[in-house]
Curated annotation (Swiss-Prot):
Membrane topology term: Single-pass membrane protein
The keyword Membrane is assigned to this record: yes
Disulfide bonds: none
GO terms for cellular component: plasma membrane
Keywords of the record: Membrane, Transmembrane, Transmembrane helix
InterPro entries named in the record: UPF0154
Species the sequence originates in: Enterococcus faecalis (strain ATCC 700802 / V583)
Localisation per UniProt entry: Membrane
Pfam family, one: UPF0154
Name of the protein in its database record: UPF0154 protein EF_1734
Keyword Mitochondrion (UniProt): no
Transmembrane spans: 4-26
Amino acid sequence: MATGWVVLIAVIALLVGAAGGFFLARKYMQDYFKKNPPVNEDMLRMMMASMGQKPSEKKVRQMMQQMKNQGK
């Protein structure tokens, strides 16, 4: 009977730990994306304009493709 209780408690602890880890990781990622949003085309245009470059559509798409390839 004691072995059954140990197994039951271990399974419950595993489930609680997995659920807790999931929600903690989810909260962390939500906060991270709130502080550091992913770069999009509008942000690239603003960055290029602030550097004194004329943000043509071709340049913006090239930079987005380079950033996507760099992440791989």
